[in-house]
């Protein structure tokens, strides 16, 4: 009797172990099949040393992962050659969609032709690509409008000015902002650009560059910066030079959360606010529409000017 029970329990244990093994295999097989059906998306920004691009990447990732897919992001750190190699690497990895934010507006034709040959959908974000024929869609802010908004505020709040420009000419979005500003002040001879310099839109570069311009042109009383990080660098230089908030009008583009405090304190005059959250989300949604066979559509989002008069409106403490 004891032997019979022992055999019976042994048989039941064997069946139980076999069932567990089958269940584990089924789960593993399901996981493998899920991984095989997940689509890869790639994103290559000009830099991630800017919270603006971190927010865009965060929004794209949220949409992609909600679809059960994968986003691979790369940071070429403002190096055009490295960006091209990062793009080639993502093409080799088999991405279906590539979001690009070019370091420069040129030199992309060869690698974008490679993306097209590999049937990769390319979507430009935050800035236009010179080789637009290789791009399925572009999602940007109205960059010329952003510069023009800053100029319009300046013209209505000052009788004249000696202006310094902080630029990033290789980035088309930045160049368009400065061009929008220049065009708007061109009809007002009391406003003159007396100094301009490149800063790649980086705070740590803008600060010493601004200090040099102030030393060479102490008459500067207006600063137009391509973005808010550059404006923050300019403000740091102005403070180091002993300027007070009322001495210099400072304009930027982006709407970084810190800009609100600087506007309240009088150090920053205004910023043309972009919405990196909408840019990222809409770029990702556009990618899925194209994958579904729908017609591609370029998107240009309006900017709005943030000043001391409206700085406390809709202040959620973060990005738009």
Protein language model features and the residues they cover:
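Hinge/cleft segment of the Venus flytrap/periplasmic-binding protein
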Residues: 11-13, 19-31, 184-185, 275-320
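Extracytoplasmic "Venus flytrap"
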Residues: 40-59, 63, 67, 72-85, ...
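An alpha-beta-alpha
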Residues: 41, 45, 60, 149-191, ...
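Short, solvent-exposed amphipathic alpha-helices that sit
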Residues: 52-69, 146-150, 173-191, 205, ...
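Short beta-strand elements at the ligand-binding edges of bilobed clamshell
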Residues: 73, 130-153, 165-168, 196, ...
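Hydrophobic alpha-helical segments within soluble ligand-binding/sensing domains
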Residues: 83, 139-163, 175-176, 203-207, ...
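Hydrophobic alpha-helical
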Residues: 97-116, 181, 192-195, 200-260
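Flexible loop/hinge segments that line or gate small-molecule binding clefts
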Residues: 105-145, 156, 162, 256-264, ...
């Amino acid at each position: 009797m004891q032997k019979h029970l022992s055999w019976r329990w042994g048989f039941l244990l064997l069946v139980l172990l076999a069932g567990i093994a089958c269940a584990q295999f089924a789960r593993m097989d399901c996981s493998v099949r899920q991984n095989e059906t997940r689509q890869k998306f790639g994103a290559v920004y000009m830099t991630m040393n800017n919270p603006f691009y971190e927010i865009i990447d965060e929004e794209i990732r949220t949409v992609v992962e909600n679809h059960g897919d994968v986003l691979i992001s790369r940071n070429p750190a403002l190096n055009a050659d490295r960006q091209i190699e990062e793009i080639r690497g993502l093409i080799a990895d088999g991405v279906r969609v590539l979001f690009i934010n070019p370091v420069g507006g040129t030199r992309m034709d060869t690698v974008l032709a490679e993306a097209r040959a590999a049937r990769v959908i390319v979507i430009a974000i935050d800035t236009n690509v010179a080789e637009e024929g290789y791009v399925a869609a572009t999602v940007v802010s109205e960059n010329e409008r952003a510069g023009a908004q800053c100029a319009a505020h300046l013209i209505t709040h000052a009788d004249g000015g000696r202006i310094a420009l902080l630029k990033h000419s290789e980035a088309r979005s930045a160049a368009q902002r400065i061009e929008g500003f220049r065009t708007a002040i061109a009809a007002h001879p009391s406003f003159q650009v007396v100094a301009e310099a490149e800063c790649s839109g980086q705070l740590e570069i803008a600060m010493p560059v601004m200090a040099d311009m102030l030393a060479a042109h102490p008459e500067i009383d207006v600063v137009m910066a391509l973005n808010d990080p550059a404006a923050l660098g300019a403000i740091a230089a102005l403070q180091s030079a002993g300027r007070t908030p009322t001495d210099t009008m400072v304009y930027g583009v982006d709407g970084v959360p810190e800009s609100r405090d600087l506007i309240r304190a009088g150090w920053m005059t205004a910023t043309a606010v972009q919405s990196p959250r909408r840019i990222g989300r809409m770029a990702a949604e556009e990618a899925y529409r194209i994958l579904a066979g729908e017609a591609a559509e370029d998107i240009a989002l309006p900017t709005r000017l943030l000043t001391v008069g409206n700085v406390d409106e809709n202040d959620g403490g973060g990005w738009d």
